[in-house]
Amino acid sequence: NTRSGETPKFNDPMLNKQWHYKNTGDETLVSPIKEGCDINVEPAWEFCTGDPSIIVAVMDEGVMYKHEDLAANMWVNQAELNGQKGVDDDGNGYVDDVYGYNFAKDQGDITWTDPEDSGHGTHVAGTISAVNNNGIGVCGIAGGSGNNDGVKIMSIQIFAGRYQSTISRNVDAIYYATSMGASILQCSWGLMSGAINSDEQYLDERSIEANAFAHFINTKRPGSPLNGGIIIFAAGNEAGACGYPAAYPSVVCVTSLSTDFTPSVFTNYGMPADIAAPGGDLYYHKNHSDAGQVLSTVLKLDGMYAYMSGTSMSCPHVSGVAALGLSYAKQLGKTFEPDEFRDMVLASVNDLDPYLTGVKKHNNGTMNLVEYKGKMGSGMIDAYKMLMAVRGTPAITVEQDKPTTISLSKYYGDVTALSCTLEVSDAVKDKLGLTFTVEGNNATIT
């Protein structure tokens, strides 16, 4: 694993406040904080920054498609953009669906100006694909390099102020996203913890939704490097069991981390959790500092950029890394099956268990961190490891100055007939003092 130098790759002025991308442990930004508690995206950007053929459907409030830092990376239905107002120009059953569709109001116009709109969907979208290297605002994980090469955001609006789509409309939304080419369904929404307590109850009460998920996951899209789709959900914010649909096995359930590898005060957790990502932690940091939250795009009334926290904010980090992974796969000419790609996402992590000891004190009480061990998912998402997995080169983090044993089967599967070659120049080997031995399924570096 590598970490980049001090010079930012892009010129976006707020990138240095996005600790969730690169955390230097700067206590003048926020405290407590630990270096390295981030998604390690800067070294990943050396290989790939996005691809406009990759579409992420943001199922949420409407995305402000006119936002200065999002407009260039919005998905556009060209047939409707260049067609006649009030006419279903592309014959897909939806009129004027230029940037997606408003399923909350059953109309083509995406909205964000209802009195109760919060900018939630716009914030989520910015984490995934705010335009990079454009000299303004923030960066998106797969927002490109400033050359119209970021992944595209499709707005699948299911909330509009006091309006909310029904389950049947949610199902329509998922089928729409599938048919219009989205490979990733980003879902920072769900039922409260405890509203549904088992997969059986979920299927009994919301089987049409589960069937729509299966359709999204298993339907091939022409030209996509993923022979299907991946669905990514926020675990929820009640500090309890993961809510549904996030807890349903076919989707990816994302928990939230603070700035120091500890679980966010609010995050849901438990065995259904699949993976963790930065989501911020307002009530953990001194003086309730906003800087310990996630910085992204918001509505114009809120100043275009703002901090938010929640599993709603951790979830798009995983969607963004998945989008970056698919972009790199497209660049390399590789294709993956849905289960294969999901496994790669969940394996592209850094271990959290070493940080889950003792207690965490916050403004509202104390957390016993041991209770979270093994219940936050496979680990903290790492963008660099994701791209190395796509390339076929597993990235493994080891500690300096101590022997490290690596289980090859964890990274390569059945290793009974594996031929392992280590290529290190004599100069590097001598400088680092490396030795490398293989015994059975284990490789040992000293």
Where are these regions (language model features)?
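Protease zymogen maturation seam
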Residues: 1-55, 63-69, 73, 102, ...
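Substrate-binding/access-modulating region of protease and related hydrolase catalytic domains
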Residues: 39, 46, 50-52, 61, ...
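Flexible, small-residue-rich helix->loop connector segments that border functional cores
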Residues: 44, 59-66, 79-92, 114-118, ...
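Short Gly/aromatic-enriched secondary-structure transition segments
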Residues: 69-79, 398
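Active-site-adjacent substrate-recognition loops and nearby beta-strands
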Residues: 110, 115, 138, 166-170, ...
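Hydrolase catalytic cores
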Residues: 125-128, 154-159, 183, 187, ...
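Proline-enriched interdomain boundary motifs that mark the N-terminal boundary
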Residues: 388-397
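Surface-exposed or secretory-pathway low-complexity segments enriched in glycine-proline
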Residues: 399-406, 413-442
